[in-house]
């Protein structure tokens, strides 16, 4: 299997896909919050998320976790369902493909328009058996070549998240205030981008256990300004994640992931 680390490959990605990561502004007609993410900060965010999701390795860009019915691909472990399989979680890999294609990335033949949009491997067993197949190697190389664009996609997701959350928030003023507090520095921008990729916006009705969500909206709604912004964000995220695991279907065995999830959000305050 081809291996490597993000430190060795990220510069190559930047050369192969020459799309600048510039200031990203989040705003709507009625909301005046903005998040400024410089090109350098964006690259650091992409590296940290790659480390979080894939251990910073090339092999980790193509994964299929035990107990899941979907592949997890790229630096953000974007979800890709096989044909006939669905679940409560938002399928993000096809959206990534459309995004990078629109920004000029060259797609592998089997990802071009007109081909089947479903994951070509039907199970984790099939996926693992194909780990060194030509198709998997093409996919892995494509993911290496588009690391910068994947980071842009992650940031764009945060850009789209705020109006979605505000449309559903029970206390819009508080959600706006907490978002602005967290977004006031580079570390907070990383926390927002990482969490919305990690656990979603919190706006999909399918992403609920016993009616309780676990996305960015729920984290912000649980904040009230009692601590420093990043300390409170991390504490609120841990509360939301513990609640998710407590509410989760037993057959998913989500408790096995909780310690890793909590360690990840602890990093937001450091």
Give the role of each language-model region.
Residues 4-20:
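Bacterial N-terminal signal peptides that target proteins for export
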Residues 18-29:
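Bacterial N-terminal signal peptides
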Residues 34-270:
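Cell-wall polysaccharide-cleaving catalytic domain and substrate-binding groove, primarily
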């Amino acid at each position: 299997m081809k291996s490597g680390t993000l430190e060795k490959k990220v510069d190559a990605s930047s050369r192969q896909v020459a799309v600048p990561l510039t200031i990203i502004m989040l705003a709507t007609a009625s909301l005046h919050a903005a998040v400024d993410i410089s090109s350098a900060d964006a690259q650091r965010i992409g590296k940290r998320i790659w480390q979080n999701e894939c251990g910073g390795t090339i092999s980790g860009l193509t994964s299929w976790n035990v107990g899941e019915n979907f592949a997890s691909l790229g630096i953000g472990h974007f979800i890709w369902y096989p044909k006939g399989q669905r679940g409560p979680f938002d399928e993000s890999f096809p959206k990534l493909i459309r995004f990078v294609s629109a920004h000029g990335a060259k797609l592998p033949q089997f990802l071009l328009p007109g081909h089947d949009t479903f994951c070509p491997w039907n199970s984790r067993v099939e996926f693992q058996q194909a780990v060194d197949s030509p198709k998997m190697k093409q996919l892995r190389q494509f993911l290496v070549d588009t690391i910068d664009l994947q980071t842009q996609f992650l940031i764009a997701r945060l850009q789209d998240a705020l109006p979605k959350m505000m449309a559903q928030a029970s206390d819009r003023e508080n959600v706006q205030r907490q978002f602005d507090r967290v977004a006031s520095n580079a570390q907070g921008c990383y926390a927002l981008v990482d969490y919305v990729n990690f656990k979603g916006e919190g706006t999909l009705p399918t992403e609920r256990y016993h009616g309780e969500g676990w996305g960015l909206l729920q984290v912000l709604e649980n904040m009230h300004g009692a601590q420093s912004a990043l300390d409170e964000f991390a504490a609120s995220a841990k509360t939301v994640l513990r609640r998710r695991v407590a509410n989760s279907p037993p057959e998913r065995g989500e408790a096995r992931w909780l310690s890793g999830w909590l360690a990840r959000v602890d990093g937001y305050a450091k």
